[in-house]
């Protein structure tokens, strides 16, 4: 279920992003993409079905936030098809990743990825964010194509450390979502993401409690 142009697209994209990965890491990324492409036909894991753009819109897009992933243990909420969690876990195996999703089909896919790709640094949890009870709160929580910012902080705020931050991946800058953030939350910074081969705007919003740096 792979596409002949994927290896070249990945190499070129990584070079454009100044990311140096081993051959085995690149093979893992492509194996993950093949799994996603295969399972997507039955499980509807992602809206991206054009094999020509999967490397850029799924792998490279996920890796575009890597410079902002500073925690040793990242929670990826609404993990769905494993984006950005699985690509990040492949690229930084020294960090731990917890992937949370309430859809049983999606978590079955994620568990299969962990098994087939040998990702010892990934844990998959089937459940809702509101019901999740981690041993300790997370300092960073990522979100991609999950929900509006208002819902993100409402549903997942209890999982975030007081001084933690959300890494919210968006397309166009979501002015309406930012305006609707509940009191006590703010966008600390916004970063325009450059994803080789992908059309359209991409933004990363760093969202945190307003009192974080007081």
Curated annotation (Swiss-Prot):
Keywords, sorted A to Z: Cytoplasm, Methyltransferase, rRNA processing, S-adenosyl-L-methionine, Transferase
Residues that, per the record, bind S-adenosyl-L-methionine: 78, 83, 129-130, 144
Matches recorded under SUPFAM superfamilies: S-adenosyl-L-methionine-dependent methyltransferases
One GO CC annotation: cytosol
GO molecular function: rRNA (guanine-N7-)-methyltransferase activity
EC numbers for this chain: 2.1.1.170
Reaction(s) catalysed by this chain's protein: guanosine(527) in 16S rRNA + S-adenosyl-L-methionine = N(7)-methylguanosine(527) in 16S rRNA + S-adenosyl-L-homocysteine
Cross-referenced InterPro entries: rRNA_ssu_MeTfrase_G (IPR003682), SAM-dependent_MTases_sf (IPR029063)
Cellular localisation: Cytoplasm
Family affiliation: Belongs to the methyltransferase superfamily. RNA methyltransferase RsmG family.
Function comment: Specifically methylates the N7 position of guanine in position 527 of 16S rRNA.
Protein name, as recorded: Ribosomal RNA small subunit methyltransferase G
Gene assigned in the entry: rsmG
């Amino acid at each position: 279920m792979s596409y002949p142009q994927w290896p070249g697209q990945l190499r070129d994209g990584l070079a454009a992003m100044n990311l140096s990965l081993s051959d085995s890491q690149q093979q893992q990324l492509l194996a993950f993409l093949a799994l996603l492409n295969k399972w997507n036909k039955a499980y509807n894991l992602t809206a991206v079905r054009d094999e020509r753009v999967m490397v850029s819109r799924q792998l490279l897009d996920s890796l575009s936030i890597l410079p902002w992933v500073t925690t040793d243990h990242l929670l990826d909420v609404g993990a769905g098809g494993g984006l950005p969690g699985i690509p990040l876990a492949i690229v930084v195996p020294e960090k731990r990743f917890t992937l949370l999703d309430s859809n049983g089909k999606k978590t079955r896919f994620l568990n299969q990825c962990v098994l087939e790709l040998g990702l010892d640094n990934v844990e998959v949890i089937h459940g809702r964010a509101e019901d999740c009870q981690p041993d300790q709160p997370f300092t960073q929580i990522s979100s991609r194509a999950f929900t509006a910012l208002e819902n993100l902080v409402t549903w997942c705020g209890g999982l975030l450390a007081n001084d933690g931050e959300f890494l919210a991946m968006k397309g166009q800058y979501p002015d309406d979502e930012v305006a609707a953030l509940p009191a006590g939350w703010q966008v600390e910074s916004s970063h325009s993401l450059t994803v080789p081969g992908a059309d359209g705007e991409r933004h990363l919003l760093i969202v945190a409690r307003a009192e974080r740096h007081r």
